[in-house]
Amino acid sequence: MYALQNAALRLEVSARGAEIQSLVDLTDGREIIWHGDATCWNGRSPLLFPITGGLWNGTCRLDGRSYQIPKHGFVRRRDWQFVEQGEDFIRFAIENTDEELKQFPWPYRLEVTYTLRERTLRTDLRVTNRSHHSSMWFQVGAHPALNLRDWTPDGQRVAGFLRFEGAPRDLLRAGSQGCIEPARVPIPWSKNLQTLAALAFHQMGNALVPIGVDTFANEALIFDARQVEAVEVLDRKRRRYARVASSAPVWLIW
């Protein structure tokens, strides 16, 4: 286990998957990252490459050949190489194996750098195509899971709210085999007066989505086309608990 700490946060990362295992707010001792309880989900914050999500029949086709790639790729199941650590950052890297070339026909190098800056954790991913002779098709993503302050095991009560930065319009959803369906669906906005007023005046930054069973009736909220720039997680009293920002063109909230 590798650790990085400043005055506000303590980060722990495992070599397996270069996955965050813990992120503690040192002001109150609160654990921010989900603890990997297998009764719900045994992950914490895996990195996804060379695909995010799944493929139809687990197969991609290129130049007349078929390749079997597991859901979310394969780097989350491997041990990464520790590269270096500084006062405020830690870096890991992974390169393809010969066996992986049977699943994904490009030699690659993937690096992740975690940086602590005051009360912010920054994650940077760098992908290198090592083939030097053909363009590499890939997806890369992060899958962080956060502890909810007001979550209850039965899941029946609203555990908090989501507030979006950007211009959220509508959603995609996963269908058969976890692949995206073509139809677009409405965002499950809260029915409270604050949100109804915000939507009426197109003030999307004041509109909230409840975190509850009904919100995730179709498993996930999938925003494409750079609709979302950041998401705030609020507790039941609408106090900000965490903020996640990314330049990724697609967000999936699960």
Model segments located where?
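A short, structured loop/turn motif at beta-sheet edges
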Residues: V83-I90, T115-T120, S131, Q156, ...
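Extended, loop-rich substrate-binding clefts of extracytoplasmic carbohydrate-active enzymes
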Residues: R65-E118
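Acidic, contiguous internal or C-terminal segments within carbohydrate-active enzymes
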Residues: N96-P153
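Beta-strand secondary-structure signal
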Residues: M1-A3, R10-E12, F89-A93, E111-T113, ...
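Active-site/ligand-binding surface loops and adjacent short beta/alpha elements
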Residues: W137, A145-P249
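Short Pro/Gly-enriched beta-strand edge/turn motifs at strand-loop
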Residues: T39-S45, D63-S66, F92-D98, G212-F216
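Beta-strand-rich N-terminal accessory domains
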Residues: M1-L62, S66-I69, R226-S247
